[in-house]
Amino acid sequence: MPPSRDQRKVLTSAPTSPAVAAAEFTEAGVLLAITYSIREGRRGEFFDLMRELKPLLHSIGGSDVSVYEDRSRPNYLMEVFRFKDEAEFTAFDDKFHKDRKIAAIYALLDDIVEAEKSDFKIFERRL
């Protein structure tokens, strides 16, 4: 239960700097988001493959990549790539489709995810 009005402390001044550094979103001009719905019991395999992929993706220009999980849907994950501009994204995309090892790992992921619940989107910064 929150404190009563009499027990609340009054702040005399606002903090001069934020406690947490805010992300600089102006750095990303293109975002690639790939969503995955992981089959029951295959979560460990998914993360093993993603750990194997990360250095390979980094080597072809995918240096800003993260994996997020939906808070309300277990085993529903999103891999997010951030690129500074269209040229950086295009260079990555060209190398991505030519790399046989990356293709082999994504082929293994196909068996782990439910394709009908997985998707990818490309977003461009507007503001």
Located regions from the model:
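An amphipathic, aromatic/His-enriched active-site/gating alpha helix that lines ligand/cofactor pockets
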Residues: 2-11, 54-64, 82-118
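A compositional/biophysical signature of low hydrophobicity enriched in polar/charged and small residues
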Residues: 2-22, 29, 125
